[in-house]
Amino acid sequence: MTCMIQKILVTSISLLMIHTATAQPISASSLTLEQGLSCLDWAEKELSFSNQLALGERTDISTPAIIKLQKQFQQQYSKQKTTIIDDSDDEGFCEDCPETTVYLPRNKSNPIQRIETSMHVSVAGVSTSIYRADDIKTTQQKIENRLNIKFSRYTGQQFKNFKQQWDKALDQDKDNGKRIKTIQVFQKYPHLKVFNGEVFQNQKIYTPKQIYIYSQPYKRDTSYLNDMIAFISLYDNPVNSSQHILQCGFIDNVF
């Protein structure tokens, strides 16, 4: 299992994104959300040479010095602490698709501190989270400009209100056997039902203060009939004020 995870991480974390899209540079103004679902598209464009080496994006360079540097970095990269969540009591447990966390070497020139990948088992979907140490507003502007999108902004309190109303609406819809109340709540707070940035720690739930979300309908491929939602979210790390988190992926629209 360790060898398999290491190979996946060093070659390209975006492989865990299944059928989304191969990571491409951000030079094209027509870049779509589907082409950028792995988040690494933005990361590779503005990132240090070291991360490009780790992600296997510089294998086309044949200079012996570069190859040597790449091997050295990949060794260092693979030695970083990697957490594999292996909880067989979880109803969504899947031995062949663990969640992984990679801590990148600390480097002032590289704002990305760690990358997490997660595959949802109970519902179809995957996501990538990138933990950044730079300014959240700068990240927001970069993504909006490069993808030609506009984030919807929410506060932590709005998300709490949404959850309370959503839970109540779910109960009412279960009683009625129809999706009426939940749709009304979603229309009031569009995008928020894909957000999962809360952190449970020390018996307490921590909610981000700033939340930016963009979402749109998504089809993974023509053979998959269910409706899906593709999303990008950007929010402050509620348990570490020096970081913000860029998350993107897709999930079944089963709510």
Regions found by a protein language model. Name each.
Residues 12-14, 36, 197:
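Small side chains
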Residues 213, 217-237:
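Low-complexity, intrinsically disordered Gly/Pro/Thr-rich segments
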Residues 23-129:
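Short helix/turn-capping signatures at newly exposed starts of structured segments
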Residues 1-25:
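Classical Sec-dependent N-terminal signal peptides that target proteins to the secretory pathway
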Residues 96-212:
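Long, charged/polar, surface-exposed segments that mediate recognition or autoinhibition
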Residues 33, 62, 66, 70, ...:
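Short amphipathic alpha-helical segments that mediate assembly, nucleic-acid/protein binding
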Residues 45-61, 139-153, 251-255:
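Surface-exposed flexible segments
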